[in-house]
Amino acid sequence: MVAMLLVLPTMGSANPNGVGSGTFDAQCGGACHGDADMNRSSPATVEVNAPTIAYEGLLTSVSITVSDIETTTSGLLGFFLLSDLSGAGDTPDDAGWTIISNSEGGTENYVEALIGAGQTTHTVEWTVRAPGIGEYPLYGAIHHGTEDGSEAPFFGASTTPVVVEVRPVPEDLPRLAAEFEPPALRTVGETTTVVMSTAFVNGVQVEWRLPGGEATTVPVSSDGDTWSFELPATLQPVAIQWRAHLTGEGPEQTTPWFTLQSEEPRWTVNESAAYLQSMAMVLAFMAAFLSLQRGRNDEESLVKDDVFEEEVEA
């Protein structure tokens, strides 16, 4: 009975510390933070935005903006990009989309953003590769806990989806090559050289920014259909965003904002040095053990000699 009383208060409560970014369907809007059947409606407003036209296999951007935000004392707010709200099999990947990056520095459809004190609006952006020809709805959803995380979680979703019509790619449309994958991660303090392959492009202009900041143009060099440019290093583990304006015989195109996240250097192990150090420790242990054993044997030998001498004298 005591155990049940201890467990019951937490069964419907939210996890104020979040679950981390990941690939989750809408069901996780409650199940990850408690019982999905005990969700309450969030008072926040969720709006999803995307171009109404995209081209098969090319990149486009989708954003979710949440206003009237209420969240836990930790400031975490979970954002979902979804292909429907059925609760299962409703990630963008299930509908054929491929997530290239998001503005929080990952490649997942679910991200947790840290909301500052007094902040009531926040936007998360995704760069995605379009699926096959057809019409595709996309939804935005959120979940969050109460102020102290002690009660049932809140879940909210966009009232209407944005419907994207995916069309065949026009023959002369300036575009990034299908095989191009923008870098998503790098180490703090390192500049990044981006080598960008294109098709039907004869001019490129690239600009970068800190999220929400002013854009700065960078020099671009070309080699046929390949274009190269450098993105500056950051001194902190923060993200920068960049995009390219592409010109050619067809209509001018602008890529989505790509996010490049800087991370602290990861601690690495020199396997050879670790192996040699381990062997040295084993040998040192064996030498110490043999030395102790030899000392013990010598001591036992001296005791036996003393006993023998006493017996002879007797």
Q: What feature does the model see in each segment?
A:
Residues S63-S67, E190-A199:
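Short edge beta-strand/loop segments characteristic of extracellular beta-sandwich folds
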Residues M281-N297:
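Alpha-helical transmembrane segments
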Residues T187-V188, A244:
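Long, charge-rich C-terminal accessory regions
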Residues M1-L5:
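Sec-dependent N-terminal signal peptides
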Residues F200-W257:
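Alpha-glucan (starch/glycogen) binding determinants
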Residues V7-L185, G203, G224, P237, ...:
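Sequence context surrounding c-type heme c attachment/ligation sites in exported
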Residues E108-A113, T192-M196, T226-E230:
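Generic recognition of long tandem-repeat/solenoid scaffolds
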Residues N297-A314:
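Cytoplasmic C-terminal tails of single-pass
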